[in-house]
Amino acid sequence: VNETLEVIRNRRSIRRFRPEQITEHELEAIVESALLAPSAMNAQPWHFTVIQDKRMLDRMARLMRENMLKSGNEFMVRRASDPSFIPFYNAPTLILISADVKDRFGQFDCAAAAQNIALAAESLGVGSCIMAMPAILFESEEGVELARSLGVPDGYAHVCTVALGYKDGPNPQVPPRKRDVVNYVR
């Protein structure tokens, strides 16, 4: 098996991170991998916001929990009410990925960038977790102000957030993969 396929096989969603920050070299390589993702018509309709400031991460975690509790969504309310719930798994780095709302394929392109981030991280020994739930961060007045303060451009909307950090423990086991989801037309 070649190195790329090995990285794909080993990548897991990590939900326990050590507190130490990833290196600048690792971060630069991971961000570069995002910028190299494919996009429809090479539009590159994305914006990446890298957050490592502990006070900002704490503020985002607090706001996410508050918005989940107010969401009216039974799953989110139950999850946010659980004292063991840690919104970003204590990851020391987050990459917020936003798409140009006018770009028809922006969400797909941002998803490709998120996968590049996760694979690059795994290849460097850095754990990652791609999350869509942080979108709820921006569904309040404080959330709109938060996006502004983070430098998210006007006309861009959250697609996903990638948590990054060193893994606090071994990779989780591979869950069983569905095998009846492929058909070939030859």
Residue ranges and their predicted role:
Residues V1-R186:
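Acidic, surface-exposed loops and disordered segments
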